């Protein structure tokens, strides 16, 4: 049940600042942030079960990330993680890449995909007929469409807009928020009350399922910096990786 918030300001010294939490079962094998040996352009964490990624960067200040959509899974879907790695490993413009995905989106379980570079940032909701080029601004995304007003998403977007964007620790602290709304404020997405309640905070501290990583992405004038902090069961810190890609 991943969540992310970002500020997109093309034409400035920092076109993109993004924070993301990846939520997943702790038993699912994962490799930490690194350059991939089989796809050297890709710099990302890796889902070792399906082989894809949830967030990564590539040379040329290319960037992609995704979240799942809460809906019934397909019986035998393609891995959504390949949507990130295929973009990063290629040379297509982000809008062109997302446009071509529209025709095959039904082969994947529900997803939201962001793909961009220094000039353009595009968004595709799996059920949309066309991708959307994003205008400058602050956005938040979870497991429904962009800026769907779930309580934790509204809270995170507001806090992000009020935080010093140069203070990494303050930014990471936003993603450690364990606040939960009252039961009456919970969305109804078909996953049942227990799951709605468990996943209603920005940070999920579960022993079986929870936040596995927090990522901070900065796009600068000539490079991208990606920092990833990993967590074990119960939200216990499990390491940090950082890299810069020109």
Task: Describe the function of each predicted region.
Residues 1-246:
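N-terminal nucleophile
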């Amino acid at each position: 049940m991943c969540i992310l918030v970002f500020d997109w300001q093309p034409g400035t010294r920092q076109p993109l600042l993004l924070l993301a939490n990846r939520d997943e079962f702790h038993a699912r094998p994962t490799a930490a942030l690194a350059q991939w040996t089989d796809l050297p352009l890709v710099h990302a964490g890796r889902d070792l079960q399906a082989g894809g990624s949830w967030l990564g960067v590539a040379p040329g200040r290319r960037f992609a990330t995704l979240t799942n959509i809460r809906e019934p899974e397909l019986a035998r879907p393609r891995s959504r993680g390949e949507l990130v790695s295929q973009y990063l490993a290629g040379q297509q413009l982000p809008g062109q890449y997302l446009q071509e995905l529209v025709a095959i989106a039904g082969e994947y379980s529900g997803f939201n995909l962001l793909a961009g570079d220094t000039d353009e940032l595009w968004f595709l909701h799996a059920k949309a007929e066309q991708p959307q080029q994003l205008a400058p601004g602050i956005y938040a995304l979870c497991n429904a469409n962009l800026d769907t007003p779930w309580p934790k998403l509204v809270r995170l977007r507001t806090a992000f807009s009020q935080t010093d964007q140069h203070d990494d620790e303050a930014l990471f602290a936003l993603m450690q928020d364990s606040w939960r709304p009252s039961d009456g404020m919970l969305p109804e997405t078909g996953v049942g009350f227990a799951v709605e309640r468990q996943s209603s905070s920005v940070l999920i501290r579960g022993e079986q399922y929870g936040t596995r990583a927090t990522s901070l992405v900065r796009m600068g004038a000539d490079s991208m910096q990606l920092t990833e902090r990993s967590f074990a069961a119960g939200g216990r810190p499990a390491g940090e990786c950082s890299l810069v890609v020109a």
